[in-house]
Amino acid sequence: MHALALGSDLPALTPARVLTSWTPNPPLLLTVLVLGALYLGGISALRRRGTSWPRARTWCFVGGGLGSLALVGFSMVAVYADTLFWARALQNLILVMLTPMFLALGAPLSLLRELLSAPARARAAVVLHSRLARALTFPPVVTLVLVIPPLVLYLSPLYEQTLRDQLVSGLAGFCLVLGGFVYYWSRLRVDPVPRPGSYLVTMWITLVEVLVDAILGLTLWLGPVIAAAYYLGMGRHWGPDLRTDQDIGAGILWIGGDIIGLPFLATVIARMTKEDEHRAVEIDAELDAIDAIEAEQLPVTDAAAPRLWWEEHPELAARTRRKN
């Protein structure tokens, strides 16, 4: 394993260095450890109370969420993020789409709710269902929260600042994860949400997000080279040229975003199907209850005695009446 300092004259990226290059990142390491300890500690507290917690959620939060965060913060992606446009594009894509999706699937807010006392839970419910929370989770708002940060990042001088200043880079990454989490939290609805909207709305929002990915990808592909002065000043003599490097990054943001969106769509469809089945069971129970109430309100009458077969025959029935 080779530890490489960010901003140094990096060696050429080879297949071996893809697997062995890494960089220390103490603030991110502390963040990952604290979040992991809080989440796993909460699960342990629930188990001491005799309450179970789904393993799938734990794997999503720790393995998928924190694991992907560590991947883009310590691995080759982080090492070459300030040198190669496509490496930074891959890093930002994971931060805005993959990491927050897995964090939301881990249901951290539900875990926190289970650990709160009854009064604290009631106060949290008031905040959750406040007008401000409902406004912030309105579908068009959360859509903008997801799609605007990448556009601002790449189509403004902010992108070059993230390359030159590690603090700005960290804050930008935090905003990407936060915006993505708000989106996935409100659309997946694994955790309680202020506005329980329809999953069909989520499907339409996803189409908008796909369109924005295409617009950003095409803009980077057909537009001028971003942060050209910075990249030229590095004096890199290996790897793709600046134009090709940016084209690769544009493809990652465009196609990669669509690929990451596939498991999200699969999860939405699965939850929509489960919700429909649950709703069908509720409707059947309500209809059965209504039928039972109506049956109790009907007057009790003696059932008519069944008629003999010859009483149904016109000629035989007439002869029987004459004899009587």
Q: Each PLM stretch: what is its role?
A:
Residues 1-324:
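Alpha-helical membrane segments of multi-pass proteins
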